[in-house]
Amino acid sequence: FEIIEGLHEGRAHKKAAECEHHLHTSLNGVDVEIHRLASFLHGKRMNANFQKWTQESMDALFGTDRLAVWDNGGTPVALAPATYNAFFILHHAVRHMTTEGVGFRQICDWTMLLHRYHAQVDVELLGRKLKELHMERIWQEFGRLAVGFLGLPASELPLAPADLAPGRKTHELLRHIFISGNFGRFDAN
């Protein structure tokens, strides 16, 4: 977290606020979250399963030569395995949605990840984890949202439901995202 304070030097920023699993700050008007714990699930058994998968994914990230790297303007950025990322980014958006509001940008992030890395997703592992962590129906509704409203090709949605047409639940989900606004801070302007 000391590194974040160094990033603030000479920039407009809001003092960083810490909570049990992340540091939240604003840097030049952009919200930044640095997680010390990737996330957690409610329920001891599900959380233990998720923490184990997180550790295995991070070990794979830093302990093998299969490291996925994104070139961010000449700076290499290590990426977690696509299967873990596909789950984690959606789970993170759902946590925000159920607590403080979710930014539509987070759904776009997940959609773009699937568009770029769908071929690298281990569908069998993802299906098993979605079932174990009780996220199958959530995956399907967000998938309908990504395909029906954001233009993700159905072929790029791992474990796509048979019926991808946005239904009542998908429209309710979309309405909730727009009402809750950007992390609960809706601004009509």
Q: Which positions does each model-derived feature cover?
A:
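Conserved NTP-donor binding/palm subdomain of two-metal-ion nucleotidyltransferases/polymerases, i.e.
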Residues: 2-189
